[in-house]
Amino acid sequence: MTRSRRTEQTADTRQALISAARRRFAEQGFAATGTEEIVADAQVTRGALYHHFRDKAELFRTVMEQVATEVAEQLVAGELARDAELPSDAWTQLRQGFQSLLDISTADSDFQRIVLIDGPAVLGNQAWDALVERHGYRLLSEWLERAMAEERIDPLPVGPLTRLVAALLSEASIYTAGAADPDTARIEIGIVLDRLLRGLGRGGDLAEQPPVSVDSGSGRTP
């Protein structure tokens, strides 16, 4: 077997494990998923699993990174496809993007279970915070700086502001994913989140910060 073919097979085995684990983690959760189920679904040996991943937790972290990256790319793609007639200022766009993330938190079962529900419990607070930082802090801070430059929000230290806004969004997403009635929770938390964010408006003038839609289907706004 050539080196290139061996490398290709190794990559295929790793991807088979990730795909099988993702299905199981999304359907059953981390705690209820056994490694024997994963290797059976992937049609590989247990030795292959431990060749690529130290343990089930490391495999879970890899799956979670994959799901989080896909959601981030989905949000960026949604912004690129945004209706040109909608408000173009950074602050309104950012707040609408937050509502889009809440929609994903409600509709995407992989994101719900793997990232929002099991993620904090399996990784712990420090690793969870690191994930949020990798997948959102830089972009969020850039948008907040744009909103300040456009004088849409009050000038504030961008570092702590980014962390606080990210924490609000993270908790709102977790609340929605874990609710008994996710659809109702998504509407309610969307209203509360946007009302809090509107308070950051220039001079605290809510009249200058009209609410964004929290449900594109029903058109409900606060």
Where are these regions (language model features)?
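Short secondary-structure transition hinges
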Residues: 102-141, 174, 178, 182-183
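Basic, helix-initiating cap at the start of DNA-binding domains
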Residues: 1-28, 32-44, 57-61, 84
